[in-house]
């Protein structure tokens, strides 16, 4: 078993595979945004994982990505100062003869800041460069240029077992594009910002081609908290930008509260939060699939831009929430009320 905790959001990898849990159907599920939000002057949670299936005979590699989370991210407004992230783990392996091997995090571990996760922040989003995903967590990886870790003594509280249901991307709450509008520039409508110049509109499909200089606005039909998942096919180095909003600009009129052209996403309510996902393609010939893991967004609308032509498929709004079994249901003849209930759940 693997026991892990951290100051900041962490994801663990063994032999190149992200650590998760296998359900009865053989699917791998992942606890997200570990270790969760706590009053870190007092408490931080640890998580427990059965990693038997990920270990192999001979050499094994274990590592973790750690981002700011609720420790030193913008969301806590400096509550704990600017202290660095930290990760702590203990791997217990019971051998066939009954002996137990214990592998802790200690000063023999190595670290670097040159991986594909360039930035991860609850408020400000995630920046990921897939070109830098070069097998960092595999036994064959050359870590000769990594540097030594340092012991952290910044946390003075209790480390307790995670309480409550796991935070997961819940499949039954996925949202799919209702409409996709692709536009180039704006046109005048007599208002402050004008309106977007739509060149293509797609209905009820989650794949499209986006060219450099174009912008796509995707309407998922309902607000929720979570992130976008997608598959992208394009040349290596292509940079995608995803912004998120709960509503569109309706008229393009500043006096009516809009912050951009009619049809674009409204983001002024985010105030100083960047709430943006940046993804740089590796350039896989068959496409590459991705979703962030160090942040989440409240959104119904997604705005996408690209530095070069790209094909996007399987665009899905993932709802990330407490994974609890629904014990009852509620339905009315009013669809908006049903959507409100679903959103609250």
Residue ranges and their predicted role:
Residues 1-345:
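Extracellular/oxidizing-compartment recognition motifs
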């Amino acid at each position: 078993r693997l026991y892990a905790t951290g100051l900041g959001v962490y994801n663990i990898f063994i032999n190149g595979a992200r650590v998760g849990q296998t359900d009865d159907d053989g699917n791998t599920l992942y606890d997200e945004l570990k270790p969760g939000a706590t009053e870190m002057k007092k408490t931080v949670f640890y998580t427990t994982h059965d990693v038997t299936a990920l270990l192999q005979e001979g050499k094994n590699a274990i590592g973790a990505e750690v981002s700011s989370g609720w420790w030193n991210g913008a969301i806590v407004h400096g509550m704990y100062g600017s202290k660095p992230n930290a990760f702590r783990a203990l791997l217990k392996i019971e051998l066939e003869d009954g002996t137990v091997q214990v592998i802790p995090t200690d000063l023999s571990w190595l670290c670097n800041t040159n991986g594909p996760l360039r930035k991860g922040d609850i408020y400000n989003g995630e920046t990921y460069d897939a070109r830098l995903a070069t097998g960092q967590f595999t036994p064959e990886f050359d870590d000769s240029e990594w540097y030594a870790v340092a012991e952290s003594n910044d946390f003075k509280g209790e480390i307790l077992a995670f309480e409550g249901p796991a935070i997961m991307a819940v499949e039954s709450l996925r949202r799919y594009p209702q409409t996709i509008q692709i536009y180039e520039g704006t046109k005048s409508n007599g208002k402050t910002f004008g309106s977007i110049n739509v060149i293509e509109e797609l209905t009820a499909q989650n794949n499209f081609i986006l060219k450099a200089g174009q912008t796509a606005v995707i309407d998922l039909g309902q607000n929720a908290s979570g992130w976008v998942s997608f598959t992208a096919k394009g040349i290596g180095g292509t940079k995608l930008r995803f912004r998120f909003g709960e509503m569109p600009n309706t008229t393009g009129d500043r006096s009516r509260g809009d912050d951009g052209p009619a049809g674009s996403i409204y983001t002024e309510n985010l105030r100083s939060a960047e709430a943006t996902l940046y993804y740089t393609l590796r350039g896989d010939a068959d496409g590459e699939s991705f979703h962030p893991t160090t942040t989440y967004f409240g959104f119904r609308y997604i705005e996408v831009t690209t530095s070069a032509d790209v094909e996007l498929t399987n665009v899905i709004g993932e709802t990330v929430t407490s994974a609890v079994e629904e014990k009852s249901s509620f339905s009315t003849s009013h669809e908006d009320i049903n959507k409100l209930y679903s959103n609250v759940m």
